[in-house]
Amino acid sequence: MRDDQVNNVMRKKEARKFFYESTGRYPVIPAVKNDEWLESAIKSDREIVYVLYGNICTIQEIVRKLKSAGKMVIVHVDLISGLASKDICVDFIRQFTEADGIISTKAHMIKRANEVGLFTIQRFFMIDQLTYDNIKKNVRDTDPDVVEMMPAGLEKMIKFALEEVEGKPLVASGLVLDKTDVTGALSAGAIAVSTTNRPMWDIE
């Protein structure tokens, strides 16, 4: 194994360890989609932050601010303006930002991120039976570090999905309206809930 491959393996191992330990302390992950929310996340005691906005000109600075505040930074690459849905955008995040990992719905992006040592979260929208039927195959194929399921309020679906992802940790997100959505998702087996609903960020 080449030195860069060894470094990538170690990088992912350390990121996984931190993610699992941090979600044990703080099960709600702030997801920021503008500069105002970014500042709120920086000031919070949450240790992991999802970045859901930015473009190729601003993402480096957004990530830098969060890293300077000691945060683990996960960039949703599908939402960054100016980045095409190609492997090269993953390489850009790896080489030109300090991000720890990515979120994506796209299998090839998750695979490439694994190759370059980024922590990976594959997001699934549980909108129909076909999505549910294919989740096991997709997860086996891409091998993400974490599976994310939307929306968060479907406790029964979270339990079913956990059976399909064969031991992968699951984060719930989307339509987190109140505390019961958070506690329900966690009680169903999710290790964390990510949300843009700022009043929910302080739930422990």
Give the residues covered by each predicted segment.
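Catalytic cores of alpha/beta
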Residues: S40, I88-I93, K137, K156-G167, ...
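Catalytic beta/alpha-barrel core
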Residues: I29-K33, I48-I56, I74-G82, E98-A107, ...
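Histidine/lysine/aspartate-rich catalytic loop segments that bind and position anionic ligands
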Residues: A107-V139
